[in-house]
Amino acid sequence: MPKVKRSRKAPPDGWELIEPTLDELDQKMREAETEPHEGKRKVESLWPIFRIHHQKTRYIFDLFYKRKAISRELYEYCIKEGYADKNLIAKWKKQGYENLCCLRCIQTRDTNFGTNCICRVPKSKLEVGRIIECTHCGCRGCSG
């Protein structure tokens, strides 16, 4: 994967508070990308990458929207630099999508019947004891 070019502009105030966590998640992402995939299905090798991407984006989202711990300028800097996924955050702000795992799970064009992923089905509508696992990202149910 090519190295992402970061802007030459200095980060806004407050960056030094969130930088260690983002660096730690970047390190986890690099480990997940280089992890051997022998013995796994093709789709299973991408699941850790999706989880870390979700974790990074949720971290930025919670800091800005829930805890109000970072400024709008720093939030926009994180989105512009690729630390958070703005499309996923836009979905999290909508009712019913607060716990969405990834954007692939709501794209209907990727399925045979034009429906959402199995992880978007509420647990109350599934059979009791049935364990589900999303083929896209490995989610076990993000609809509630």
Curated annotation (Swiss-Prot):
Involved in the pre-mRNA splicing process. May play a role as regulator of AR transcriptional activity; may increase AR transcriptional activity. Belongs to the BUD31 (G10) family. This is Protein BUD31 homolog. The lineage of its organism: Eukaryota, Metazoa, Chordata, Craniata, Vertebrata. Signal peptide: none annotated. Residues 59-67 are annotated as: Interaction with AR. Contains a short sequence motif (Phe-Xaa-Xaa-Phe-Tyr) that can bind to AR and may modulate AR activity. Identified in the spliceosome C complex. May interact with AR. The modification N6-acetyllysine is found at residue 125. A motif (Nuclear localization signal) lies at residues 2-10. The gene is BUD31. InterPro entries: BUD31, BUD31/G10-rel_CS. It comes from the Eukaryota. Pfam families: BUD31 (PF01125). Detected in epithelial and stromal cells in benign prostate hyperplasia tissue (at protein level). Its main location: nucleus. GO terms for molecular function: nuclear receptor binding; transcription coactivator activity. Keywords: Acetylation, mRNA processing, mRNA splicing, Nucleus, Spliceosome, Transcription, Transcription regulation. One of its GO terms (cellular component) is spliceosomal complex. GO terms for biological process: mRNA splicing, via spliceosome. Transmembrane segments: none annotated. It is found in: Nucleus.
